[in-house]
Amino acid sequence: MAVAELYTQYNRVWIPDPEEVWKSAEIAKDYRVGDKVLRLLLEDGTELDYSVNPESLPPLRNPDILVGENDLTALSYLHEPAVLHNLRIRFAESKLIYTYSGIILVAMNPYKQLPIYGDAIIHAYSGQNMGDMDPHIFAVAEEAYKQMARNNRNQSIIVSGESGAGKTVSARYAMRYFATVSKSGSNAHVEDKVLASNPITEAVGNAKTTRNDNSSRFGKYTEISFDEQNQIIGANMSTYLLEKSRVVFQSENERNYHIFYQLCASAQQSEFKHLKLGSAEEFNYTRMGGNTVIEGVNDRAEMVETQKTFTLLGFKEDFQMDVFKILAAILHLGNVQITAVGNERSSVSEDDSHLKVFCELLGLESGRVAQWLCNRKIVTSSETVVKPMTRPQAVNARDALAKKIYAHLFDFIVERINQALQFSGKQHTFIGVLDIYGFETFDVNSFEQFCINYANEKLQQQFNMHVFKLEQEEYMKEDIPWTLIDFYDNQPVIDLIEAKMGILELLDEECLLPHGTDENWLQKLYNNFVNRNPLFEKPRMSNTSFVIQHFADKVEYKCEGFLEKNRDTVYDMLVEILRASKFHLCANFFQENPTPPSPFGSMITVKSAKQVIKPNSKHFRTTVGSKFRSSLYLLMETLNATTPHYVRCIKPNDEKLPFEFDSKRIVQQLRACGVLETIRISAQSYPSRWTYIEFYSRYGILMTKQELSFSDKKEVCKVVLHRLIQDSNQYQFGKTKIFFRAGQVAYLEKLRLDKLRQSCVMVQKHMRGWLQRKKFLRERRAALIIQQYFRGQQTVRKAITAVALKEAWAAIIIQKHCRGYLVRSLYQLIRMATITMQAYSRGFLARRRYRKMLEEHKAVILQKYARAWLARRRFQSIRRFVLNIQLTYRVQRLQKKLEDQNKENHGLVEKLTSLAALRAGDVEKIQKLEAELEKAATHRRNYEEKGKRYRDAVEEKLAKLQKHNSELETQKEQIQLKLQEKTEELKEKMDNLTKQLFDDVQKEERQRMLLEKSFELKTQDYEKQIQSLKEEIKALKDEKMQLQHLVEGEHVTSDGLKAEVARLSKQVKTISEFEKEIELLQAQKIDVEKHVQSQKREMREKMSEITKQLLESYDIEDVRSRLSVEDLEHLNEDGELWFAYEGLKKATRVLESHFQSQKDCYEKEIEALNFKVVHLSQEINHLQKLFREENDINESIRHEVTRLTSENMMIPDFKQQISELEKQKQDLEIRLNEQAEKMKGKLEELSNQLHRSQEEEGTQRKALEAQNEIHTKEKEKLIDKIQEMQEASDHLKKQFETESEVKCNFRQEASRLTLENRDLEEELDMKDRVIKKLQDQVKTLSKTIGKANDVHSSSGPKEYLGMLQYKREDEAKLIQNLILDLKPRGVVVNMIPGLPAHILFMCVRYADSLNDANMLKSLMNSTINGIKQVVKEHLEDFEMLSFWLSNTCHFLNCLKQYSGEEEFMKHNSPQQNKNCLNNFDLSEYRQILSDVAIRIYHQFIIIMEKNIQPIIVPGMLEYESLQGISGLKPTGFRKRSSSIDDTDGYTMTSVLQQLSYFYTTMCQNGLDPELVRQAVKQLFFLIGAVTLNSLFLRKDMCSCRKGMQIRCNISYLEEWLKDKNLQNSLAKETLEPLSQAAWLLQVKKTTDSDAKEIYERCTSLSAVQIIKILNSYTPIDDFEKRVTPSFVRKVQALLNSREDSSQLMLDTKYLFQVTFPFTPSPHALEMIQIPSSFKLGFLNRL
């Protein structure tokens, strides 16, 4: 294909323009070879004849489909105007600041805050392949992080660009991305420290320049270290070429480093006052630029932020203050006035205030500093000479000193930051972020620009090699033949600078000479390079500068200052003075052999991928140039050992206007930063790369029918390309892609557009022809009709007569009758046939329906009798079995109890006789006890008298204390008056001390009041003790009276026993009735036999009738076939009915044998009952004798019981009184000792406080002597008071000694009584047990007699209480089996929802019924802890979380339903209301369970989101549900080799299947429907948010067709909601933003009405989101129109009235508030069964 073929009519080209660099024009006439001009049509409508020649045709413009591409290398035509136009479209119109250029990310500074850097954006880019999302700094960071994690290879991100282009911000965002995606729970503070290092380095290394308000004046390479888990463990920072000259000089409208202005803004704060600073306008070093304020920046607030970051990194306040001291000293040094003394000398006054502050801050001697600022010492071999300096020389020396100090301080801060970021573990990999200055050229370029451009040459060389390498890797991967690509190698420029005898070496050589000058060095350059090296030039009009042809552009450097800046020397005497500084930090800066910083304990050794020539080390060089070359060599060695990623920051305009595109400035930067070089390298190879599928779908329109019939699409693509492009060198076929040379895609687009244009013409031709033909035929037909009617009318008028009219009328009459006859005959025939068919069909249907009804009726009769017979047989067998068991069990119990009763009665008689003998001795003992009680009464009276005396003594002491209290109050008033007088005399500085002393006095007063209160409490305690003694004496008297009443009451109880014996005798009489019941049993046996025989006869008759009926009409097989499936299933449910039906003929024989066996069993049972009746009659006679004997001795037993109980009641009272007296004595002694110790401790504290106050007062001691004397007096009084208290305590001890004697008597008496009473207690216990056994036997007899009366009544089903009985020791087993070990899978299908919860609540009811608080509390705590544990162990198990969320909610609902509260009992049944808790309120546990349920729900949602999130974007956004409507356009983006496609081919069906799985699992586990709706709503919100966020970040998805696909997928989700009956879950509403976004992509976007409709319809989208979608809208085909910037502005103007969020992304982590509805359980607790699989056999239903 010839190039000239592309220059045809309607194609567009680019022509140069002085204002816009390039402007577009359309070819108005086809170009032919040999034409001298090209007829063009400009955009303003004017025509232009553009001069051309075949070798320099204007560059062609790319098709519109390729305009706005994410990657510049994806453009078909790769040249400067195409790149510039693509950037303009993306930046100025689409507001997209990032664009790829191969492996470079081009970042345009928007000069505006954009909402594209939040955590939601970071999470959206995390895990994505580079190229899947829109270009972003986060995409580059993710690519570096992914390659590091996947390949275990170190990475580097190289950020470069002009000052003000956004390098620092881009590097900061990259570091923030790493800190966010690699954050771990254990080392979360490390990421914060890494990010905190940025504000500090910006404060001390950034400054305001004419181009940038926050320009980095140094290079920085930050290595972020990762461990094997790819988590940040530390960092290390390296800096390059700090601009030290800025410390002492700033150009107009520039500032010094930020930290100086922050310090001056905070000068008035108390912590900075000692620095003696003022405003920034007062210091020479900060006011030189003329503007000390940056608009919109608060330096004081920035200072606070800087201090916070210092603290976050672990820098203490002392360290921070040392740094601020040095900074303040630099400012004061700049203000030191140097005056000229003649022409040869200068001087500094020692009284200079700034000099004094400088020396004071740094700990220097002001005299020496003043001397050596104006003099220098020259040391020769023979002597030392002090040479004075002129004023300019002295000023330079002062400034050199300031620069040196600041450089050392900057290095020291970086070193300390590295120490704060160092780590102890082993570094596995690292990612380096290089923030370095880009290529610079100014009106005056000096040594700094030379070093910067030298560094950029090295980086550009490394960049070119890397691009070349990646191209080669791509070709090898696709098996494309490799062809050599010519690219620019800037090694000659590097050699010019760093080679032997290069510019740097000549500069160092000149610096070594004592009299070296800039002019001599420049002359050497002229001699060595002019006319010898084409890259070095000498300006024509200057002898003080030189020109170097750099990669980016030519730069002219002024030689002035090169030597001075390269030497960077400070005079020795000034260094010696600083080295001897008393300020330790300053002295360390100037030590001769400083220890080099060791940032890391263990660093990875990096090796260069390419052998780099090391710098010449012939001489030891300490110049700035040699140091910079060495550090640059190490940097390049590190970068070569890593995988680089490039970010080129572009400054769109110099006025800092938002989204303003200055073409000239941008082209200049694109040329300088290597973007166009990347384009040029790509253009020489195969820049356009499309997959086979993309090519097939895009250019299928160019294929023939035969080619489309091939099944192999890859082969079809090859055939088509061979046909369309004859030159096979213009494309290559790879494994997965087709590679095109520059212009070939545009050529294919031209062919496609021509084909579409031809097709449109063809369609239009046929459509217009069809319309014209249709119109012609319609007109022709109308003309013919008109002619027909006209001609007919004329013919009729000519031929009409009267005869003709008659004949015509007669013919019509004949026709009418004839046609009527024929129609009637046909109708009658059809009607008869129809009636006959209806009769036969209706008869047939009626007979068939009758037969069916008859069959069903007979089948029902058969089923009725069969089921009745089987039911009766089952009932009778169960009834007989139950009766036999009941009779056998009851008879055995009666026999056993009668035998036990006989044995116990014999022993009882013997014991009663022995008790009668002991009765006489007990009476004597009672009399002795009465005598002792009288003695105890006398002792009580003595105690009462002693108590009165003690009370009088206490009252006297109380009066003394009150008197002493009044004295203390008067002293207190005097002390207060004196203190007030003293405070008026003291100065302001002693306010704190006087306040402290006043507080001490108040403490003493409070202590005194506490002592008084303690005395009052003591007296009250003593009075209470006396009163208690009186009450005890009175109680003893009352007890004596009660004993007498008990003796009288015992007679009454004996009468009760007599009545009980009478009742028992009546019960004995009922035994005779039991014999009568046995006789009735025999009679019933005879009746049963008769009934059985009658049943036999009836069954035989019925069976014969049934068999006869069956044999007459049907056979058995016919009945079996006619039974429906439901009948068969119903038969199977009753068990073995089908087999019974088949054996109806044998039923008679089976029944006969069965009834015969029953008859034999009944006869045997009756014989056994007769034997038992005889035995029972004998036992009853024996019992009657025993009852008579018991009646005789009952009276004596009751008297004995009365006596023993009276003795037992007295002895414990004596014991209790004695023990209480002992406890009171011990308590009194302990309290007195404690009070004495407290008073001593307080006195010691008072003395210590006084002693401390005396030491602190110092000079104020004399003024406060009066107060101390008052304190000593109070101390003495307190000591006296303590002594009085001790005397009182001694007195009390004496009183207690007398009481102790009484207690001894009580103890002796108690011991004697206990010995005597022990035997009596044992005897009494024995008698009580005997009586209890007799009573139990009587009760059991009465129960057995009652049961015997009901022996024939059928026992009904057992009624349960809805509780589960368990033992305390089984609680752990219950929790283990029911909660921890329970596996829901396979169990939930066969049980009621929330069965474990119901079981737990039934256990709670049991504990509540016992009124056991400890048991209930233990069960609830164990249950809650068990649920927490099982959830913690299965945090990733969705089914387990769903199961226990359901059970927790059911358990919570049970606690509410059965709590007894009316609001929860509305829907309960009466039986459920009976099951409510009776004793405890568990509302607190309900709150705890609610909190547990909320935590489970949140984890439950997290797991669902984690499972569904990976399939949302592939299924909702990328999958094309509407086949044939492709929503994507081929991008041709060239991914990195590591960007492997990890998608698993998810579709919309995958999303629906995952949702169905979640829904089914929740329903199976019995989750409340309301909770299911809330969970579905949360999932749908996530689906909508993730899809919408991805749409915002993928420009290729913003098209009309993709909007249709999204709308289709949303309809699938809505249909799913409808199928699951979840329309009311509000889930559909959460998809409203996504629905509106899909609508916005499809709607028309041209007119004002369209803008208004968008404003009114898109209410769920914010203004930022709407504008983002409009700016990102990308047409797929040429017939679609782009959204014009004017339309976007119209919409934005309408949206300005909204007050909504400025955030672009939706928060995918947002959780709706969960509510747990109260749903009462419909299941009755009494009916709940426990499956055996639960292993809860130790629980018993009650």
From Swiss-Prot:
Myosin motor domain mapped to chain residues: 67-753
Q: Which parts of the chain are coiled coil?
A: 884-1351
**Is the DNA-binding keyword given for this protein?**
no
GO BP terms in the entry? actin filament organization
Going by the UniProt record, its keywords in alphabetical order are: Acetylation, Actin-binding, ATP-binding, Calmodulin-binding, Coiled coil, Motor protein, Myosin, Nucleotide-binding, Repeat
Which residue pairs form cystines in this protein?
Answer: none
CDD domains for this protein: Myo5c_CBD, MYSc_Myo5
Q: Name one Pfam family in it.
A: IQ
Which residue range or ranges hold the IQ domain?
Answer: 756-779, 780-806, 807-829, 830-854, 855-884
- GO MF, one example: ATP binding
On tissue specificity, the annotation reads: Expressed chiefly in non-neuronal tissues. Particularly abundant in epithelial and glandular tissues including pancreas, prostate, mammary, stomach, colon and lung.
Domain (Myosin N-terminal SH3-like) ranges: 8-62
Residues annotated as binding ATP: 161-168
- Residues bearing the modification N-acetylalanine: 2
Query: What's a single GO CC term here?
Result: cytoplasm
Provide the residue span(s) of the region labelled Actin-binding: 632-654
Cite the Dilute domain residue spans from the record: 1421-1697
What is stated as this protein's family in its record? Belongs to the TRAFAC class myosin-kinesin ATPase superfamily. Myosin family.
Function (record text): May be involved in transferrin trafficking. Likely to power actin-based membrane trafficking in many physiologically crucial tissues.
Can you say what this protein is called? Unconventional myosin-Vc
Q: Which gene encodes it?
A: MYO5C
